[in-house]
């Protein structure tokens, strides 16, 4: 007979801290259901779980309501980027050039 629940992990990293929670969810739970059961939104009130991008082991889940979880999977909640990564790289390179005394 199959277990009535499976164990999964939910992770989120805010600017201040990181949390990894191990959660038992009913077999057949979707990503969206597991996030609700995890209570992670209570620890991070700024999280809007209906709007956050999520993934499993680094792969984005396009439909969290339909994706059924398997035992041992890790749901990752992704934050929005605060700055454009290309612009950050340009600024970093410019600072490095200035430090070495090279023309920009």
Swiss-Prot record:
The organism of origin for this protein: Pseudomonas syringae pv. syringae (strain B728a)
The protein, known as: Protein RnfH
Family named by the database record: Belongs to the UPF0125 (RnfH) family.
Matches recorded under SUPFAM superfamilies: MoaD/ThiS
């Amino acid at each position: 007979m199959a277990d009535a629940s499976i164990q999964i992990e939910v992770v989120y990293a805010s600017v201040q801290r990181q949390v990894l929670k191990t959660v038992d969810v009913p077999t057949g739970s979707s990503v969206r259901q597991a996030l609700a059961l995890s209570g992670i939104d209570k620890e991070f009130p700024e999280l809007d779980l209906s709007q956050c991008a999520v993934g499993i082991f680094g792969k984005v889940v396009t439909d969290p309501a339909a994706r059924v979880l398997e035992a041992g999977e890790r749901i990752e909640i992704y934050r929005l980027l605060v700055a454009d990564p290309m612009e950050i790289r340009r600024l970093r390179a410019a600072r490095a050039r200035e430090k070495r005394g090279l023309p920009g």
